[in-house]
């Protein structure tokens, strides 16, 4: 009987310990799971929001936005110091040329003439590298990461295709694709801001 009581006590302690452990929350979008946090450049980042990019009735990709501090303001997110990460999981095959043209077009639509003058050389170099990287297939994970004093890196399934583009202004320009005044998808913008999850 004493042994049974001892085991009951041990199991009770273990159960309370397990329940006290922090849960790793996951947000799911179209079957894609985004972790609640990640580490980039040695700094923890939080999932600000995740959502679905649609074109007409087609599901194109799921996207998660990771920042140092959650916020519902696009300008506050873009101006937060520290690393940031955009994670895109493709839900269909995407032609490299069309994807690149869409990204460049969305940057242009959300940037002033003066901003484009400063961005053009870096944007053209990024576009050239993206086109050379080949088509992205369904299930591919594209990461667009920014680390201060290092720059913007774009990878496809862990393979770097755009390496260390300098300037935080460049990453802000990419963020404006989804968070700018003329976002690629208004519904996705709300989801990334945590306003429609």
Question: Where are the regions that the model predicts?
Answer:
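Cysteine/selenocysteine-centered motifs that mediate thiol-based redox chemistry or coordinate metal-sulfur cofactors
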Residues: 186-197
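Mid-length scaffold segments of soluble, non-membrane domains
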Residues: 71-149
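N-terminal secretory signal peptides
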Residues: 25-80
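Flexible glycine-rich active-site/ligand-binding loops centered on an Asp-His dyad
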Residues: 163-188
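Positively charged n-region of N-terminal signal peptides that target proteins for export
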Residues: 1-6
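Sec/Tat signal peptide C-region and signal peptidase I cleavage site
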Residues: 19-25
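Bacterial N-terminal signal peptides
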Residues: 8-18
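Short strand-turn-strand beta-turns centered on an Asx-Gly dipeptide
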Residues: 155-160
